A protein has these predicted regions:
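Short beta-edge strand/loop motif at the mouth of beta-sheet-based domains
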Residues: 11-12, 31-68
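Intrinsic-disorder/low-complexity, polar/charged segments enriched in Ser/Thr/Lys/Arg/Asp/Glu/Gln
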Residues: 7-13, 20, 56, 70, ...
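Short, highly charged C-terminal tails/helix-capping segments
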Residues: 143-149
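Beta-strand/loop substructures that line and gate deep hydrophobic ligand-binding cavities in soluble
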Residues: 83-134
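Contiguous, well-ordered beta-strand patches that form the walls/edges
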Residues: 66-78, 82-91
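Hydrophobic ligand-binding cavity/cleft-lining segments
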Residues: 1-43
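Hydrophobic pocket/interface hotspot
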Residues: 23-24, 33, 57-59, 75, ...
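Hydrophobic/aromatic beta-strand elements that line small-molecule binding cavities or substrate pockets
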Residues: 14, 47, 71-76, 98-105
Length: 149
């Protein structure tokens, strides 16, 4: 039995101790995004960030074995501080492009973030991305805790 689109869609919800605008900005500011994007223990660089609809980004992830894995995409929707939609593609493998939707909701003095990644192709790929995003979101929690405005 093959996996359905819903089976291969990743959805993660987290609550952050920061207002929606602060959480949203951490996705579109190069220095901030670079500080937390990627799984724990992985260094990332963002050589390209055009934070506008139709703008592109590129992230280079340095693995512990020294390999560099580039990810690139295009911003489809930027609706501050509520919604951010962008493509996510592993360079060199156009068949692995997916769509990420970040939705932010105010919850008192906190923010509920939902990350939905569609088009992952397989349950295994969904699970691998889930591990990576959960780790990156752990880093975002820590970053927002130590970098308050």
């Amino acid at each position: 039995m093959s996996a359905t689109a819903e089976d291969t869609t990743l959805e993660i919800t987290r609550v952050f101790d920061a207002p929606p605008a602060r959480v949203f900005d951490a996705w579109l500011n190069r220095e901030e995004w670079q500080a937390w994007i990627g799984p724990e223990g992985m260094d990332c660089d963002i050589p390209l960030l055009e934070p506008r609809v139709g703008g592109r980004y590129r992230i280079t992830m340095r693995l512990s074995d020294g390999r560099v894995v580039p990810v690139a995409g295009v911003f489809k929707t930027i609706d501050s501080p509520r919604r951010l939609v962008f493509t996510w593609g592993w360079e060199g493998d156009p068949s692995r492009e997916s769509l990420i939707t970040i939705t932010l909701r105010e919850k008192g003095d906190k923010t509920e973030l939902t990350l939905r990644q569609e088009g992952l192709g397989s349950v295994s790929n969904r699970d691998d991305h889930g591990k990576g995003w959960n780790s990156a979101l752990n880093k975002l929690v820590a970053y927002l805790t130590t970098h308050r405005p």
